[in-house]
Amino acid sequence: MAENKGKFYMTTAIAYTSGKPHIGNTYEIILADAIARYKRAEGYDVYFQTGTDEHGQKIQEKAEAAGISPKEFVDQVSGEVKRIWDLVNSSYDNFVRTTDEDHEKCVKKIFKKLYDQGDIYKGSYEGMYCTPCESFWTESQLVDGKCPDCGREVQPAKEEAYFFKMSKYADRLIDYINTHPDFIQPVSRKNEMMNNFLLPGLQDLCVSRTSFSWGIPVDFDPKHVVYVWLDALTNYITKIGYDPDGSTDQFKKLWPADLHLIGKDIVRFHTIYWPIFLMALDLPLPKQVFGHPWLLQGGDKMSKSKGNVIYADDMVDLFGVDATRYFVLHEMPFENDGVITWDLVIERFNSDLANILGNLVNRTVSMSNKYFGGVVTSTGVTGEVDADLKAVVTATRDRIVEKMAKLRVADAISEVFALFRRCNKYIDETTPWVLAKDEAQKDRLAEVLYNLTESITIGASLLHPFLPETAEKIVAQLSTSLRDFDELNQFGLYPDGTKVTDAPEILFARIDAKEIQPKVDAIQAKQKEEYEKEQKALNGGETADEAVIDMDPKEEITFDDFTKMQFQVGEILSCEAVAKSKKLLCSQVKIGNTVKQIVSGIRKDYTPEEMVGKKVMVLVNLKPAKLAGVLSEGMLLCAEDENGTLSLMTPEKSVPSGAEIC
């Protein structure tokens, strides 16, 4: 067994229970599970916690639309989340729910403690509120008048609230981040937090709400419910035994957390709010917060209305659990967003899982049965190419250790497949089928098959954290077991004389895209049908196309005011993402004989590639202004639906660039 290296407490963000998680949401639990399994193999005593975040205004509104209570709603969604987490073979130790009685009780105590010691005070809040993000913003923080996080519409809000004195701890947090370079990873996330939030100065944080009731009541002022982030973030301590009145031995053993694994969109909450809450509670900070990138559906936003959402259970039905795990782990870069499409999944399945891995195992076991009745023996008859094979195989473990220490999981799994590629090359170099024709080469053939079997055993053991079912199937076919981590840099431990299975199983049979496509079409059609039903329920029996949106009327303008605005048709020549923004695209728009640069907050709904060539409606004579440091010389006209999805306004018929809109 690997030497016990002590505890390793890791968490995912708890999933918000507003709906069924898609594959982009599921990526996080698969990534976390791979890390947890790897750490266990290394010899750590891992405690892996995940769960669901179940309070907030958005959930209350969704429950009302569904005609059920918020608790019934979150019970359904939390159950669905847990089902999917289990489906993808995640080995968590604790699945938490923020509606659990012990959590709610502890949150009340935490709020009271912070209030009693003067870190929380009562006041009132007036600002702009984003319901999906459950966040307040000042006018200056908005981007194009919309939420800087999600790009949706915000609403003015004023209410009595309790506030946390963030500024009291800001300098201390800045010092901590500067002296603990691994605290926020990747480094780009750290720079974003420092430059965009901490260094400009923190405002006090609203930590209670009165405009809705679905939350944990403030004990001493029950018309207030605890703000969702103070509620949700504290699960990392409440569910392992923290108590302001005296914590358990488990808490003392596990805290501080070794790793919070979260999506890049909630880094701010985990690296600013959370550490400041912990400082106020006089608790140590987590050792590392890692903000992983997103998994996007092609170049497009996942949307049920488009039928392009990919769910983990659909992927598992079509490709299997480990193929699903392999794709999301292998295709996600360290910092940049990854891309998933059905075609890419099929391509990766066939090239890597079927050709490289499945074919290797099947050929090796089949040749052992064909030439030696399945008995694998080391004869010591070596060849020139053996040394290089052994060097590659025995060096792989340490290369993986290096990658995993930096949480470069995609690179680590690529190292395992580099080992399998080397094995396939070894088959081509040694040509066992040729050796089998020469009785004098029988011992050499036996050694070749032993080397392959030993290499595959090591590779399967290294693969186990990432594809556990596949790794176990491989060693079962080789009639052995997974190798101890400390032994994975040694060659020759496969027991001499072992008999492999005489009925090798095809691990991954190649997939014909033409056979899969009808199933994908059915999935997409079902999504669109479900979307229409949901919209009909939300819109009082109307379909999405029949639904209407009422807006509060704005101040009337005169005809003269209107004629001051110049609207024309433009053609987008080129488009690129604005480097300093997650929401903005910068387009070069041809309007007649003029080209204008226009910055728009539509990145969540359009990719730069989608924009090129579109005919759009443009407000041409808008006063130029800089957005995220980039000059914008006009405005593209869009419509926004009830879900905040933007659609560019385009002419119905073909009209030339520069045509007047009147």
Name every feature range the model reports, one short phrase each:
Residues 122, 331, 343-382, 392-500, ...:
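Helix-rich, typically C-terminal accessory recognition domains appended to large enzymatic cores
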Residues 541-662:
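Phosphate-backbone binding interfaces of nucleic-acid-interacting proteins
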Residues 2-77, 96-111, 116, 133, ...:
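N-terminal catalytic cores of NTP/NDP-binding nucleotidyl/phosphoryl-transfer enzymes
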Residues 1-4, 38-45, 66, 70, ...:
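Secondary-structure transition/capping motifs at alpha-helix termini
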